[in-house]
């Protein structure tokens, strides 16, 4: 078998020749490949990189054939090392694990692709208006295609917290897209006030990595509907932390009763409501949540204002407690409920989240 010097050194038999029947002269073309790769990499800001390669087709078949003869033809590691060294020399960047850019080289077709590590940004957001969703919500009738129901927007709601935060980030980072990971979510018709809700923004395929986050914060906050604060760079692990941590939340609800309720009776009901709450999946979300009973704690319930049939109440609760159903009882699916304790039908007219601790 005619082999280049690299493959001859790996296989240990054959003839050193100009044309390699094993790697098709991939080793001899490393500098050429590196030039092409570095040209593409220059479109992105990066400090670190890594190289991986794929073996399949005829090269894989050759490996299997040589293996039957007791010869281990491991080309990937040696090729990756040579290509990485060439890229290091041309860019001054370092090869590391968890890099900004990963080069995936196909040793069968001599093509490559770049995998760009996302940028992760932690912060807190405030939602100043009602009736926008936390994340993009496609129209259920056309699945995002656009129809008369959604006025050909493809969306159920006019906008979302995710879009209003992502759009400035995509522009500044010159990214393909951005995705919001929130610490829970408020109802579409609820505001998120106070110090805001923790979130991580995942910026996908950014061409710029080192954006001044103060500039990003100002760009987002120039809009009327959403604001952010305390932005800082983080990593992918923060997404898991934000999504799994059990945050205690405080809500302010405007409650409307079917008939007048005495103030003392209402205060007593709120006091007795504290403690363990058993909630079967609310009817309003049963189409997208598993139907089961969840046990959550209500830590505090305070009367802020009361006039006849209307009250303003603050609830401090464990994450996952549905406040609207805590008030109404949801036809007995939530027990105890404020309506049950007072003995009068009740509903939440307006709801704000005022703290996520």
UniProtKB/Swiss-Prot annotation:
Instruction: Please name the catalytic residues of this protein.
Output: 187
Annotated binding of substrate, by residue:
251, 322
Please state the Enzyme Commission number of this protein.
5.4.99.25
- The enzyme class is isomerase
Q: Which residues form the THUMP domain?
A: 1-118
Q: Name one GO biological process term.
A: tRNA pseudouridine synthesis
What does the record give as the reaction this protein catalyses? uridine(54) in tRNA = pseudouridine(54) in tRNA; uridine(55) in tRNA = pseudouridine(55) in tRNA
Matches recorded under InterPro entries: PsdUridine_synth_cat_dom_sf, Pus10, Pus10-like, Pus10-like_C, Pus10_THUMP_arc, THUMP_dom
What are the alphabetically sorted keywords of the record? Isomerase, RNA-binding, tRNA processing
Sequence similarity: Belongs to the pseudouridine synthase Pus10 family.
| Physiological role | Responsible for synthesis of pseudouridine from uracil-54 and uracil-55 in the psi GC loop of transfer RNAs.
Q: What is this protein called?
A: tRNA pseudouridine synthase Pus10
Q: Which gene encodes it?
A: pus10
